[in-house]
């Protein structure tokens, strides 16, 4: 498992959206899709399906330049429906 820290925002949305840390860690370690941020080369987005949550796509955005990586935000991405 990759080591990571969470921003205050990430902690808040994980709690509010009832996102399990196991899901976040799974997507962080084994994404179905990886996207670079076009404006910030330090930001990366990992996207993965969560079968236990209706096969929805979980998007995890993090700063890769920090050690450990810093989770910026996490959310279920409706725009990814049918794309993974």
Predicted features, each with a name:
Residues 1-84:
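Ribonuclease/tRNase effector modules and their secretory precursors
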């Amino acid at each position: 498992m990759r080591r990571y820290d969470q921003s205050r925002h990430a902690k808040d949305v994980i709690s509010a959206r009832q996102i399990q840390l196991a899901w976040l860690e799974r997507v962080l370690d084994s994404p179905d899709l990886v996207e670079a941020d076009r404006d910030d080369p330090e930001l990366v987005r990992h996207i993965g399906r969560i079968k236990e949550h209706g096969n929805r796509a979980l998007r995890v955005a993090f700063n890769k330049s920090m050690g450990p990586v810093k989770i910026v935000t996490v959310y279920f991405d409706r725009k990814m429906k049918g794309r993974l």
